[in-house]
């Protein structure tokens, strides 16, 4: 190496050393975030606790809305304007796109659980806009984010839980069911069973089978409800009903199940249920719904532990009747103005 080349190399090494010393040690990498917490969100009704339950509805709105023959039926029951009003008031959530919807009524609260793709920030803003008295906000889980916000809406306590972008839960009324639902979602209530997994609804759910719309009520039944269906409700441990599409143009197959210790009285109880169904079909309300003109006449069977009624009805007639009879209630649930009196 020549003296000139050696001097050049020495100067370059000195420059590199100086630059290294000036930069100091490399900054430490940020610590990793908390590991993801597994969420158990399906089926939606597996988040509904059993304690204090009065009734529960399990529905698959998207599956219903995807049946072409049912689109005009839905339009009669719930006009497009009401779907739009609900979406505008709830952060863009379209009821018809909800994969699973569970509504559970308790003595002093109501729980609505929707499993659907959503924008959590938008849904949270919509809740804040509806609230007439702000409460608070908590991030219960960081990864994935489980956010809880609460407040009052026109004097009613309400609480919203957002499970990432996958599901939302709304509690209305006295606090309690939402906490249990969150614990189910986080897998913290291993010794407890959700409403449809424990007695007495697990048995009636198994007999009823799967359907896009199902409704359940646990016994014992007292007061006016005990006199329902020819007095059979008093002896029932649970009652459930389902509805499903049964073919064009808009046939709806309905199944009704009453569980109880019917034993040797099953045949007589089945005859009593058939008579009660006939009385209902011939009543003003039954005629309004068109159940006095079934597509397939009701068939009632009985066994030691269950009474089962199956029939098929005209879905268009059912929708028209329900629209006329329950218009105010649908307005309360979906939102939007009620129709003008006729």
Predicted segments, located by residue:
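C-terminal motif of bacterial Sec signal peptides marking the signal peptidase cleavage site
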Residues: 19-22
């Amino acid at each position: 190496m020549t003296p000139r080349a050696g001097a050049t190399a020495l100067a370059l090494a000195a420059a590199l050393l100086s630059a290294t010393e000036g930069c100091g040690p490399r900054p430490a990498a940020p610590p990793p975030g908390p590991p993801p917490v597994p969420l158990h969100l399906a089926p939606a009704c597996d988040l509904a606790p059993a304690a204090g339950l009065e009734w529960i509805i399990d529905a698959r709105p998207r599956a219903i809305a995807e049946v072409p023959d049912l689109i005009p039926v839905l339009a009669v029951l719930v006009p497009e304007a009401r779907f739009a009003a609900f979406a505008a008031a709830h952060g863009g959530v379209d009821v018809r796109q909800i994969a699973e919807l569970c509504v559970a009524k308790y003595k002093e609260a109501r729980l609505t659980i929707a499993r659907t793709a959503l924008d959590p920030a938008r849904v949270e803003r919509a809740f804040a806009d509806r609230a007439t008295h702000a409460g608070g906000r908590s991030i219960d889980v960081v990864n994935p984010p489980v956010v809880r916000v609460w407040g009052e809406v026109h004097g009613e306590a309400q609480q919203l839980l957002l499970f990432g972008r996958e599901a939302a839960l709304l509690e209305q009324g006295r606090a309690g069911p939402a906490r249990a639902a969150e614990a189910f979602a986080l897998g913290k209530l291993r010794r407890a069973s959700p409403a449809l997994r424990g007695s007495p609804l697990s048995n009636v759910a198994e007999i009823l089978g799967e359907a896009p719309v199902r409704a359940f009520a646990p016994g014992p039944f007292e007061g006016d409800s005990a006199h329902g269906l020819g007095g059979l409700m008093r002896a029932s441990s649970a009652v459930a009903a389902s509805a499903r599409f049964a073919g064009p143009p808009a046939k709806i197959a309905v199944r009704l199940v009453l569980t109880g210790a019917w034993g040797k009285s099953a045949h007589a109880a089945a005859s009593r249920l058939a008579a009660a169904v006939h009385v209902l079909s011939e009543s003003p309300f039954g005629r309004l719904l068109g159940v006095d003109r079934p597509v397939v006449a009701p068939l009632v069977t009985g066994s030691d532990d269950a009474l089962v009624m199956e029939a098929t009805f005209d879905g268009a007639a059912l929708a028209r009747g329900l629209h006329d009879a329950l218009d105010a209630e649908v307005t309360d649930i979906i939102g939007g103005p009620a129709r003008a009196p006729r």
